[in-house]
Amino acid sequence: MKFFIDTANLEDIKKAYKLGVLAGVTTNPSLVAKEGIKFEDRIAEICQAVPKVESVSAEVTPDAVTAEEMIAQAEELIKINGGDEKVTIKLPMTLAGLEACRYLTEKGVKTNVTLIFTVNQALLAARAGATYVSPFLGRLDDISEDGVLLVAKIAELFDVHQLDTQIIAASVRHPDHVTRVAMAGAHIATIPYKVIEQLAMHPLTDQGIEKFAADWAKAPKL
């Protein structure tokens, strides 16, 4: 399973990229709004900061409700950073979003259909040609449904029908989510930087480092 970072914060993206584990970036209008910068400018900055990733998701804005409006926005977004091929158009899981997805796919544009909460939604998006689908774990957990089980069902369905669409586990809130979606068959987990930090940490690791340091301090030196 690959890792994307879910943020529009440039410093967090740069820190994650330096670790050598990052395969992509996902953003949304809410994340960009927190940064207080023009959307297109931030996407361009992200593309420049992570030259070797496979995807930078740029979502159409909420005021684009028809397929035509989404496509018009997408055609501007794919020009970012000189037509950077990493730019992936993120579309909502609506009928208009599916129509836009099919059109963009036929034009060779990568797409990420987001706000997936059912297997049927994922299947529709895959059949519309989506490069990625993004089921939301945490939001399902919030209403006492099993987000990880949804990922597992989508993965099984895609395998049975030999669909190439990749599953991005989104709304990932803690390390256990990451472990479970990896075992459930997600191709990618998109996670905030704080979860990346949590994945790398364990108290026994810290204790081991401290023990090695203490022992080394006592060792004879030449």
Swiss-Prot record:
Protein name: Probable transaldolase 2
GO cellular component: cytoplasm
A molecular-function term among this protein's GO annotations: aldehyde-lyase activity
Homology family: Belongs to the transaldolase family. Type 3B subfamily.
Record localization: Cytoplasm
Annotated metabolic or biological route of this protein: Carbohydrate degradation; pentose phosphate pathway; D-glyceraldehyde 3-phosphate and beta-D-fructose 6-phosphate from D-ribose 5-phosphate and D-xylulose 5-phosphate (non-oxidative stage): step 2/3
UniProt entry keywords in alphabetical sequence: Cytoplasm, Pentose shunt, Schiff base, Transferase
Disulfide partners: none
Gene name tied to this protein: tal2
EC category name: transferase
The enzyme's E.C. designation: 2.2.1.2
Major site of localization recorded for this protein: cytoplasm
Keyword Transferase tagged: yes
Function: Transaldolase is important for the balance of metabolites in the pentose-phosphate pathway.
Active site, per annotation: K90
Transmembrane segments: none
Lineage: Bacteria, Bacillati, Bacillota, Bacilli, Bacillales
Catalytic activity: D-sedoheptulose 7-phosphate + D-glyceraldehyde 3-phosphate = D-erythrose 4-phosphate + beta-D-fructose 6-phosphate
